[in-house]
């Protein structure tokens, strides 16, 4: 039996590691969840994700409720108060229980002398909640995005930025990819219905299903047997443009965790696929995904800027480059992105993308297809990146996705749609 732990203090420390130390929640959370009971795993995740989603609001409230911020060794208390405020604002946890557990969290972080302070701040919020929220709703913090990102979205999407921000602040839908080598989408939807769950097919992507209500993967018909994979609809859209064929040599570059690698093999089971990623640790997930689905691919660790180091002079019929990016299209799925990214990262990422594109292009056969994809919504990484590439690359031609003046297809995040995603299909003349 797992030792009873204070979830509020665990959430506070996790959020602190994200915001203060720049660590990714997807690295921090799984080891923490191993320490708690199954029923507490979901609540711990809810507290971490929720606080990061609404961090601007919680920070704003603390600045109103406290004369001066907590600093130094007491900084964790700042995040513990955030966890308390989040529960009072956004969960169904009874207020007395939320307060009691949050105050007890002070003992777990070895700050028992601050229990009274935490209790006082949270009770003050309860008394002043109405007027504080009215004031908050007229502040810039209400958009729940850092100011640098808000400015970029407003500049890029003067008519749509508010709907993008709104989508980013929602909980994400759960999208699945039906493995067409096992079932048609309709036959798997019938199995889902028999299991007491409801799913909706995507209008454009033939394998994509949105669950009416997110569910644990072990509850999905045939998940362990590889009948279905969790993958956002927009990520599945890459196959529409790549159109892999049996017998072809295909490179999936920046492949981890392997969702697109396995999708290529579902669409073209007899393709020869090479999956490459710079991160050796994340490549283990590519192996895991291939194993669960019973598929084979050549998996290599390598830097996309130096392809000759891992493929020599080899050329490919098709290349999928899912480029490293700001991930500004998947904020609703990874709210820590808002606080991990900085404005200065964008030109650095654009430079990296440009270097990878230039390096990998010679490894595409004449007449071959390269699909450039990102989960970003920022033009510097997307349409402007491809426009510049087309201008400097004489044998590259845009195909089916946009115009040379406005190249690529940009998906924006939507409540019943996929994440923010960009695609450009390029043909080598």
Curated annotation (Swiss-Prot):
> Which reaction(s) are listed as its catalytic activity?
cytidine(967) in 16S rRNA + S-adenosyl-L-methionine = 5-methylcytidine(967) in 16S rRNA + S-adenosyl-L-homocysteine + H(+)
User: E.C. number, please?
Assistant: 2.1.1.176
Instruction: Output a single Gene Ontology CC term carried by this record.
Output: cytosol
Q: What class of enzyme is it?
A: transferase
Q: Where in the cell is it found?
A: Cytoplasm
Supply one GO molecular-function term: rRNA (cytosine-C5-)-methyltransferase activity
Recorded hits in SUPFAM superfamilies, A to Z, give: NusB-like, S-adenosyl-L-methionine-dependent methyltransferases
| UniProt cross-references to Pfam families, sorted A to Z | Methyltr_RsmB-F, NusB, RsmF-B_ferredox
The protein in question is named Ribosomal RNA small subunit methyltransferase B
Species source reads Shigella sonnei (strain Ss046)
Q: What is the lineage of its organism?
A: Bacteria, Pseudomonadati, Pseudomonadota, Gammaproteobacteria, Enterobacterales
* Gene name of the record: rsmB
